[in-house]
């Protein structure tokens, strides 16, 4: 399976100049823990970073910095892991594990943002596949037992 098949195409995004209170409200309103920060190139969103709820807590609140003094671009993570739409989902999982990230933007070959994959999405896929494999094993055992009776 390719990344494009699993990714959520409803990505909540922010600009670098968005205020932290606005970003936090957007996260709350959209029920997400991160915002993909984008710049626009020829009208297309290009991911340049990610802001997580944890970033807000660690970088601002724990340091007692005024929310009005910083913007998304000041605290977002710039070293953004991105995967292309045609990458194998197992390769995506390995890259996420190696970098220690739970969410990764999916981009087109031209670098345009097309979706996002969360670790939970991969876990759900694997869980479904394992469940189906388990059912096959149980069905084969039942068929074998029926043949012998």
Named regions from a protein language model:
Residues 10-13, 46-47, 82, 112:
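Short, flexible active-site loop motifs that bind/organize anionic cofactors or intermediates
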Residues 27-30, 35-55, 96, 104-120:
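A glycine-centered beta-loop-beta connector
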């Amino acid at each position: 399976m390719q990344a494009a098949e699993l990714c959520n195409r409803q990505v909540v995004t922010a600009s670098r100049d968005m205020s932290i209170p606005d970003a936090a409200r957007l996260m709350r309103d959209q029920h997400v823990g991160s915002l993909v920060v984008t710049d626009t190139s020829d009208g297309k969103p290009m991911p340049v970073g990610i802001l997580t709820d944890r970033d807000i807590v660690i970088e601002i609140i724990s340091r007692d910095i005024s929310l009005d003094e910083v913007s998304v671009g000041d605290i977002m993570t710039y070293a953004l892991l991105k995967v292309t739409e045609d990458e194998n989902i197992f390769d995506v999982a390995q890259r996420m594990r190696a970098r220690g990230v739970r969410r990764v933007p999916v981009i087109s070959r031209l670098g345009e943002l097309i979706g996002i994959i969360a670790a939970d999405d991969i876990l759900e896929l694997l869980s479904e596949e394992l469940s189906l494999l388990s059912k096959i094993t149980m069905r084969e055992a039942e068929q074998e037992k029926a043949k012998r009776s």
